[in-house]
């Protein structure tokens, strides 16, 4: 199974179209969106081609393959226009012997972790900064960065998981980091 993880679109039609192209090219079995889909939020500048209505149409076209969690900029009004669930605070994906806990990062993160077992993975967006860091009880924190508003001079990016390997990629599809899950 191949999964694609993306976070923090923040209403950018330009980057939603890029994501749509990536999904077509990567051909994942599921795309996991880590929140902050339509609204840019009060702390961010407007992203390139800010157009939440167009982003809604693009994402609704992908609805059969999307699993999404709620970000701090997502609201009930967003759920009214999106045709797939977006209001869950987290999802748990069994990958081999581990659980991958996917969330946005504003509620559960390395400072306030969910109830992880030894060796489980916490995967979230929110910071707009790619990450792969050990923490807790032999746990790992992963972050794909942001599709539309990367921070700390990082690339616009996303992440895939295939055959037990997480791969961080730029929006041009170029890999720049890998982490292999050990069972």
What is the meaning of each model-derived region?
Residues 1-13, 28-30, 93, 141, ...:
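Amphipathic repeat-derived elements
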Residues 2-95:
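Core catalytic region of metal-dependent phosphoesterases/phosphodiesterases
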Residues 42-45, 78-82, 88, 112-113, ...:
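Short, well-ordered secondary-structure micro-motifs
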Residues 59, 93, 102-104, 145:
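Generic structural signal for conserved hydrophobic packing positions in ordered secondary structure
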